[in-house]
Every structure is written in C-alpha cells, then in structure tokens.
Amino acid sequence: VSEHHVRLLEEHAHRQLARGDVQGAIESLRQALSQEPDEPGLHALLAAALLAARRRHAARLEAERAVALAPELPEAHRTLGYVRMAFRDLRGAAEAFGRALDLAPDDPHAHLGLGRLHAAARRPAAARAAIEHALLLDPGDPDALVDLGDLDLDAGRREAARARALEALQSFPEHEGALELMGRVLLAEGRTEEAREHAIAILRQDATSRGGLRLLCAAKARRSLLLGLWWRWNAFMSSLGDGRSILVLVGLYVAQRLAVTALKDAGATEAAGIASLAWIAFAVYTWIGPAVFARSLARELAAVRLRADF
C-alpha cells in the first residue's frame, strides 16, 4: 500500500509540474520521500522541481543524492546537468549531460539540455544540432520548438521564429516560453502593444514568471524613450557583473574628469560646464531610473488578473 501511495504521489507531482504548481509538486515529492527516502527517481524529480522554484542549492543537493543512489539512472545525471547550468558550471553540466546520453542515447530531454548548454556557451550551430535532434526524438515538444525559435530570432530569422512559436502555441496555447518568444518577435516588428499583451497573458498564469516580467519590461522600455535608455543601460551593466560594472563606472568618471580638465585648460569653460552638468544628469538619471521604472511597472502589474487556479 505504501509503494502504491508513493507512485500516486509521484504521478501527482508530475501533473502539478505540468500545470505550473511547483510548490505543490515539491510538497508531494517530500511526502513520497518520507516513505521511500532512498528512491533516486524521486530525488531527481524533486531536484527539477526545486530548480523550477529557483532554489538551486537545494536542487543541487537532491540531484547529487540521486546520482549517488543510482549512478546508472539517466534522469539523475540529466537533472544534475540542468542544476550545474544554473550555477554556470558549463563544464560540469557537459559532463553530466554526456553521462546521461551514454546511458540513454535517445533521451530527448538530455539532448535538449545539451543544446541549451551549447547556447549558453555561445555555440549556436552546436546548439541547433542538439535541439533539432531532441525534436526528432520527440516531435512537437514545445520546449524544443521554443529553443529553436530563440536561436532563429537571435540569428535574425524572424519568420522562422514566428513559425516555431505558432507551432508550439497550437498544441500548448498557454506555454510560457512560446508566448514569450512570440512577444519577442512582435517587439522586433515594432508591435509593442501586442507584445505587452503576450506578457500579460504569461503573468496571468504566473505572476512570478521571469519570462513574463522580462517581456513586459522590454515592452515598457520601447514605449518610453527615457525608460528605454535606462533599461538598456541597466541591462548592459548587469551583463558585465559587479566587478566589471564598477570598473566601467570608475572609467567613465575618470574620463569625464579628464575631459573637463582638458576643456578648462583649452579655455573652453562653457563646454567644461556642460560636460560637468551632463555627468550630474547621468548620475541622477541612473539613480532615480530604477524607482521610476519600478513604479511604472507596478501600475502595469496592478491591472493583471490572475487565473483562478493560480
């Protein structure tokens, strides 16, 4: 009876994950593990659920536990690969996905993970080959379609990206990744309001969705020149990391001081004053920009009505 109950809890967790109820799935899996604490498949699935909940440290513990319990289990290595990707350990992730494919060469999810790894490492050709192989093994998989669409859009193939998004949405109308991809296509075409509607559609399903918030922010940035400039500057600085962004700011400040000094030495005091004012304006703008953007976004999110089953 206990084993049957565990299997029911596992199946229920799968259904919960499929509809986006990540916390519910975590609770179901913890109940199952309280009865079968050494079941590697449950640990692997719990790791995937914890990763979806952005609890990567807990996910790593569960994934490593699954591999330790069953080194021959492909899904344990596959899940460990995704967890390592969350830590930006691309070499470790490649090793885990490689081991998963050694054990199960026809596992579409492992091929998809390998494709995402190549994409993260900026190897688009290798990423496309791996994801297309995953799609060959599991035709119509919306995640693979969206990943291929992302590669198409990044390469400037807008129509191909649109076709991928529409194919995924045809079978899965509420698929978050497909909605975000379609929104990105619309943004690239300058159809900002329609892109915003796709972002709202995502947020109705999950108000914490990073994809939905990312798309909504991008749409807001397109609708306001000042907010758009701040958004692009912030995105650029965030991509550098803390250390490099500090170096950039220090470099800009030093360059500004040198320029002002040079202008004064050349007798161009008016130009030096303008340069000083421009720096002050830049400093104030980057200081108040986050608050203005957050307030604008909060007004947008206030209009979102969540689904009843969220």
List where the protein language model places each region.
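Alpha-helical linker/edge segments of TPR/alpha-solenoid repeat scaffolds
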Residues: 218-244
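Helix-start (N-cap) detector for alpha-helical repeat units in TPR-like alpha-solenoids
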Residues: 6, 40-41, 74-75, 108-109, ...
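Register position in tetratricopeptide repeats
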Residues: 18, 52-53, 86-87, 120-121, ...
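Alpha-helical segment of the N-proximal tetratricopeptide repeat
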Residues: 2-41, 45-52, 82, 86
